């Protein structure tokens, strides 16, 4: 039996450059999980800078070797040859993807990256679903091809419409482009007119699974689900996601009809899905006739509870409903679901993954359908993400400890340490002798699971501050932006292979299906902008709203973009229809709308309450300007130092004396920028660095800037 792979194969390596050997035209790389590779640059290697949707190819081939500096994170795709010494492998790189123009820069941390991405996503789906520019949802189709074309079926599913409405509403919030809100409003009305049922007898609201459009005036209602896992039942998650788009739209408009629909659907959850016994939680399915979760007609869904029925309320609609209203009832609902998750889902004596499916008494259901005793990697990450959000609303040790535990376990259990990215469904436990959790079907990676990782580690870093969380957030965002964006056609790929190449076969080929609509990609872009700008790079964030007359209760527009760490964000400025407006509570994050206002457009600029770097020009003494620098000096914060330097030069400084007593870190890019300042100003221009910590002083000395400046 062959004991080693004795053939060539192509694959991807993700990692950090540790050195470049010019004589061998090769560089060394260390992966996220600490494994070393030697990478030879093949004769035809080409390199590119990661690009956003809507951007052209950014060729970096000519500068490639100068870019291979220690610390830079990149992707190398190439060929392994079993020709090395003692049977080792040699790796020839064919394609290099660079994540930023300098070694410590990540392009997706630019303040406008996610905003431009959501803009492109919005336009892609508008063109795909409404090519004539008229937002008539009778023309909407669930299934879209990889090119964005409508496929044959005239089936319209409530959840996929709602998810797309969520996307359009989020695109409006980040861009202020009215067409996105018009599409969201039209979709919300269509859902209400064609899918909503108000049961006056039982005082609840529920939503049809789908309709089949027969012609312009005729359709066939599909009440119970016809999706295989949920056939002839009313799944809780479908009722949950029917609210996703309308509630996100409600955050913008305050339309009372949306709030009434949400309240009616919540009564459905509390009346029929909720287990009112001492066991608690929410059942996953109802019988479509009796609304009984224990009905034998439900088969393998009889009296079951799962992650979706308990955990999906929060991200799909409930957090957004609380953000828009501030209603304590919704905060209590959130607390109930997260307390249930924290109590029932951990199973760490048996697996690094949570248990996701249960019987009514919370005993484990490990024989259900496709899931068996398997883990969905993204659900674990989703729990960590949303627990952290909830911790910011109602802090509990149990929320923080479980979120941190998941964050610590998942990289080894669910991520790809060599190539980057996150896997899909794996076996929860290892068999004797196994080191790797076995894949349920394949080692492909789904777009939505990357989203969960990015958002989880971003908010974990923004809330608790651990640098390792930012590392994983950046690596996850790098994989998504490098490999999931269809920069040729638009939209994002459903799945990529383990090596990042698109997988376009079967139901995973298209850009729209029962499983994919405008939700996760838009949610990632929206919250990616929120978390990155306000919590990581500490930059302003702009949001737009269009309140309806008589909409928001007491005329209060709540503008908090998410449940962020308390006191971390404030309102900097507000305009209404382009004119400055001062009636707002900066720290309370709400705007008091004008009494009896009509149709208005509100623009709000949010800023972090603490910034990552301060650089203050303190005047000139003996021709030397004084600039005090505090915080983290990185590519994302260099603009503050540049502003202070510009002020000093404008004041006629013949040199600059930098006070670095408050500086906690200094990137190589910052040192090089100061060297270029010295070069451009000439030999008579003096530089002094005072008060630097030993670590900062070591950075300065190692860069040889001490040859050009006085380092005190």
Task: Say what each PLM segment does.
Residues 630-709:
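Amphipathic alpha-helical interaction surfaces in cytosolic regulatory modules
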Residues 306, 616-619, 679:
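Short secondary-structure boundary/capping segments
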């Amino acid at each position: 039996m062959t004991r080693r792979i004795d053939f060539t194969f192509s694959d991807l390596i993700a990692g950090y450059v540790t050195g470049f050997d010019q004589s061998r035209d090769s560089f060394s790389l260390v992966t996220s999980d600490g494994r070393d590779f030697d990478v030879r640059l093949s004769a035809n290697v080409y390199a590119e800078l990661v690009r956003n949707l809507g951007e052209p190819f950014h060729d970096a081939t000519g500068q490639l070797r100068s870019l291979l500096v220690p610390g830079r994170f990149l992707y190398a795709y190439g060929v392994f040859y079993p020709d090395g010494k003692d049977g080792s492998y040699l790796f020839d790189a064919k394609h290099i993807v660079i994540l930023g123009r300098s070694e410590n820069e990540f392009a997706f941390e630019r303040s406008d990256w996610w905003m431009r991405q959501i803009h492109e996503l919005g336009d892609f789906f508008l063109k795909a679903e409404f090519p004539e520019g008229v937002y008539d949802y009778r023309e909407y189709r669930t299934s879209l091809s990889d090119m964005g074309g409508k496929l044959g079926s005239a089936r319209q599913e409530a959840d996929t419409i709602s998810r797309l409405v969520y996307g359009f509403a989020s695109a409006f919030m980040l861009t202020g482009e009215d067409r996105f809100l018009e599409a969201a409003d039209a979709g919300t009305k269509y859902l209400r007119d064609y899918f909503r049922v108000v049961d006056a007898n039982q005082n609840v609201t529920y939503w049809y699974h789908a309709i089949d459009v027969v012609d312009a005036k005729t359709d066939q209602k599909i009440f119970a689900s016809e999706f295989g896992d949920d056939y002839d039942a009313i799944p809780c998650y479908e009722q949950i996601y029917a609210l996703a788009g309308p509630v996100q739209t409600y955050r913008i408009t305050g339309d009372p009809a949306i709030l009434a629909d949400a309240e009616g659907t919540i009564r459905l959850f509390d009346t029929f899905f909720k287990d009112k016994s001492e066991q608690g939680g929410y059942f996953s399915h109802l019988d479509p006739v009796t609304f009984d979760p224990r009905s034998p007609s439900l088969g393998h869904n009889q009296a079951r509870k799962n992650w979706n029925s308990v955990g999906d309320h929060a991200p799909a609609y409930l957090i957004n409903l609380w953000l828009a209203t501030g209603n304590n009832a919704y905060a209590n609902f959130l607390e109930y679901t997260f307390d249930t998750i924290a109590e029932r889902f951990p199973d760490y004596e048996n697996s690094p993954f949570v248990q996701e499916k249960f019987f009514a008494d919370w005993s484990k259901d490990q024989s259900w359908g496709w899931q068996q005793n398997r883990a969905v990697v993204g659900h674990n990450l989703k729990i960590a993400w949303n627990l952290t959000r909830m911790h910011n609303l109602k802090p509990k040790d149990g929320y923080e400890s479980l979120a941190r535990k998941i964050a610590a376990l998942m990289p080894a259990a669910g991520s790809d340490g060599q190539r980057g990215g996150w896997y899909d469904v794996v076996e929860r436990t290892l068999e004797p002798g196994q080191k790797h959790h076995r894949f349920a079907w394949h080692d492909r990676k789904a777009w939505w699971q990357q989203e969960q990782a990015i958002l989880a580690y971003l908010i974990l870093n923004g809330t608790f501050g651990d640098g390792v969380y930012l590392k994983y957030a950046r690596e996850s965002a790098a994989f998504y932006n490098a490999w999931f964006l269809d920069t040729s056609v638009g939209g994002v790929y459903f799945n990529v292979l383990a090596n990042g190449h698109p997988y376009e076969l079967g139901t995973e080929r298209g850009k729209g299906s029962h499983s994919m609509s405008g939700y996760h990609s838009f949610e990632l872009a929206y919250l990616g902008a929120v978390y990155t700008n306000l919590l990581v790079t500490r930059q302003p964030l702009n949001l737009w709203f269009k309140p309806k007359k008589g909409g928001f209760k007491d005329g209060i527009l709540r503008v908090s973009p998410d449940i962020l760490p308390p006191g971390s964000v404030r309102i900097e400025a507000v305009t209404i229809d382009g004119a400055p407006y001062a009636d707002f509570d900066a720290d309370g994050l709400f705007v008091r709308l004008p009494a009896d206002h009509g149709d208005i457009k509100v623009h709000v600029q949010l800023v972090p309450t603490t910034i990552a770097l301060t650089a203050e020009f303190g005047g000139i003494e003996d021709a030397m300007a004084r600039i005090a620098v505090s915080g983290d000096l990185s590519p994302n914060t260099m603009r503050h130092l540049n502003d202070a330097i510009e002020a000093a030069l404008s004041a006629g400084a013949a040199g600059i004396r930098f006070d670095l007593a408050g500086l906690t870190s200094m990137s190589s890019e910052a040192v090089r920028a100061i060297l270029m300042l010295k070069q451009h100003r000439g030999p008579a221009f003096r530089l002094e660095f005072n008060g630097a910590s030993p670590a900062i002083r070591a950075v300065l000395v190692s860069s040889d800037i001490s040859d050009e400046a006085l380092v005190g």
